[in-house]
Amino acid sequence: MFRTLTPAKFGPNDADNVANLSALADKMVADFDGPKDGPDAEESGIPALYTYFGQFIDHDITFDPVSSLTKQQDPDGLVDFRTPSLDLDNLYGRGPNDQPYMYDGIKFRLGEKLTGAGVPDASDLPRFKGRALIGDPRNDENSIVSQFQALMLRFHNRMVDDNDSLSFEEVQQRVRFHYQYVALNDFLPRIVHASVLDELRTAGQYDRSKLAHYHWKTYPFMPVEFSVAAYRLGHSMIRPGYRLNDADNMLLQIFPDPHNPDKNALTGFRAMGPGRAMDWGRFIDLDTRPYGVEDDDTNPDNKKRLQFAYRIDASLVDPLRKLPPEVASNPSSLALRNLERGWRLGLPSGQAVAKAMNLAPLTDDQIIIGKAVDEPGAGDPQTGIATIANGVFAGNCPLWAYILAEARQFQTAVTIPATGAPATGINTPQLGPVGGRIVAEVFLGMMFGDNSSVLSLDPQWTPVTGSSFALKDLVAYALGQGDPLH
């Protein structure tokens, strides 16, 4: 998108670049704070499932098995091994004719029944020797995205049942339309500030002519500014852990405790254990639940509440400081991996991208590394970007960190669907005019450039249940609730 800009440098040689980026990465990771029930000052007003819906979308549109963290890379030489379109190839794979082991006729095969949440027909993914038989193996990398993949299998299967005269391809198109509709009309407005999205519309409709920075010749491509920086916003939304259901042992860390590796965690690439079915109302607002009481382990409402994503900010939770060896290594810090990848791929600084967009860049004083909580405490350090690594980042912030820090400046008070919640809403940082514009233009461009997408075939289309159809309705439909979809 901005390939004519000069790559950002953070030192005179490779060793200094890595050392300085490592210093920044250390400041971007919060102190240890284990998973807990109850409200949390780091929560946004975005239900937790949107973090993993974003991951599901990422697996639909991107796959890069070849770029390196040990040498400089030419971004033009990278290949996206996924189609850069929201076409659900991570769900459908190559279809029932080419991958019949995933299908039973034109419906998906489902896995073993799951227990623990009282959810009818909850099931694991179909597996062979523990490995999931699905369109993209990455959608089994943690328990949440794995169960969402299984839910999407059920969404397709119910669509088949409700439309028994349709062919596989016709059902597939309807599933894609609903998924794309949610991505455009629910997911994007959750993570991108309304002022950014408004600039991409004409008379309330997204307008291809408003795409100012994302242009393709024949087919849409995957810009590194999106895949390596802007769309890595989800890493800051991850909580230290999540409660799957009521059971005492189902408040789980995202990774195993290195001091107690046998303890349950949300690690994937294995069959679901007993009692691990997700109560979806803890992840998306299927119903109205109590908000809970902060720092009160005795309050029974805290175990049943809807969990919310952490705020989009320049801070990651402590478990992401050192990823398990089976996930990543050298480096094991997720923040450093992101920063190094952006540098080795030659990304410009956030300030340079802002100027190229004809925007006034954030000042160094506005680029705060740390949690965007309302009232920072002793455990919430707020570090100005210019004070890190002897000022090497002054006026020269890595694009990923810049985009996360920018969100702090674009907060919206979100009213959340919970009894007892703050009447004024929850302050929720959203992607601003640099990060949000990159994400929104790539989403829209991928759809405008795909001749089979909802924006290309029928931009006025809405689900039969109404224009308010959202992720919660997609989940409810997959669970067998609500009216049929056609």
Residue ranges and their predicted role:
Residues 1-138, 142-143, 161-486:
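Terminal regions of secretory-pathway proteins
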Residues 153-162:
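Active-site nucleophile-adjacent alpha helix/oxyanion-hole segment immediately C-terminal to the catalytic cysteine
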